[in-house]
Design a protein with these regions (language model features):
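A general structural signal for well-ordered alpha-helical segments in protein cores
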Residues: 35, 48, 66-69, 87
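Donor nucleotide-sugar recognition loop
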Residues: 80-83
Length: 121
């Protein structure tokens, strides 16, 4: 089954920006957290933000994402397997929107697969 779109993690977004990766032929989204991580290192963050918003759908941190992240955080904490907060929010965005996540950090995000995360590629 072909994905109805994908959520792109910061690691892949950087590769796309550097010309090391091409966008797939399907709708591509980024989390607002990914947008922040990406533009904060740019010489002109305002211009980088505008360009990213022209190319990708930007998914905000809404109640659905925050609730999903909170539930997963408690489960990870109980097992002593917490991950970076930003990655948790990106993963929760992917899960709550039912979008596979394209990331270079598969080992890290694989902790979220049992919580409903699907990794792309």
């Amino acid at each position: 089954m072909k994905a109805r779109g994908i959520l792109i993690d910061t690691s892949v977004l950087i590769d796309i920006d550097r010309g090391k990766e091409d966008l797939p032929d399907l709708p591509c989204y980024i989390s607002i957290v990914t947008l922040y991580e990406f533009i904060r290192g740019k010489a002109d963050p305002i211009k980088a933000k505008a360009l990213a918003e022209d190319i990708f759908g930007v998914i905000p941190l809404d109640n659905k994402v925050i609730e999903e992240a909170s539930i997963i955080w408690r489960k990870l904490r109980s097992k002593g397997e917490l991950i970076d907060e930003r990655d948790l929010l990106i993963g929760a965005t992917s899960i709550s929107r039912m979008l596979p996540l394209w990331t270079r950090n598969k080992k890290h995000f694989s902790k979220l697969e049992e919580h409903g995360l699907t990794l792309w590629r």
